[in-house]
Amino acid sequence: MEYYVVHQLNGEVTGRNRPFAALTVEPEDTLDLLVAGDSESYNSVSTMRLWDDKGITTYDCGQGAQRIPETYYMLKHAFKKQSPKIVILETNTLFRDIGAVKSTQEILTQAGQYYLPVFRYHNLWKTVVDEPEMHTNYKGFVIRDEVDPYEGKPDYMKKKKKCETMPEYVKVYLEKIEELCEKNNAQLLLVSMPSPKNWNHKRHAEIQKYADGKGITYLDLNKKVEELGLNWTEDTQDK
């Protein structure tokens, strides 16, 4: 029933629930790569370019300000029908501290919506008999051509002695994501997209320490800005 309703209404699902709905109607076992995280993920990973250049089928299931319980249940939902070889987790979401009370509420909400999806789509059931207008879907990737140049210091990744600690509930869910990927034979890859606004060496050091301790591959593209040929005045919205 969930598949039927979401298949009919996929074009009407907007906001935070859209990636869940879109993944529900993706053909089974057609995705090689899943990308998760906040807006850094769906603004940075071009699903269409990966297909055109490398023949890699990708879905970006990121959400604006995605919280780690959302990430976990998004991936759990995706693994119902998909068998990706790699899961990329954009790391900015790992430092989103919403406090003990809100994190508990978020965990309960996401668990409830996963096991009882009627609550995720409850506002859409009344329109099941309609013929909704479908919208263009770039497999989760968001195309933006606005430019808002970064004019700050170029050494935003200057080495610091201390790390910025991830919240404890984030570590718990990160381990759950690791276990989920291992169970489904998918490699977890932690990636930090170039972002002077959101990233610094303290965060890099924390993720690097965690990844080294767990044997997880970590790629920080903030350390490869020159190699990427990134031009902060023309290529970004990182003001």
Give residue ranges: language-model regions.
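Short hydrophobic beta-strand that contains or immediately precedes a catalytic carboxylate
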Residues: 33-37, 239
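Membrane-embedded segments
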Residues: 36, 40-117
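Loop/turn elements at helix/coil->beta-strand transitions in domains of secreted/extracellular proteins
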Residues: 30-31, 56-57, 83-86, 182-189, ...
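Catalytic His-Asp segment of secreted/periplasmic serine-dependent ester chemistry enzymes
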Residues: 204-239
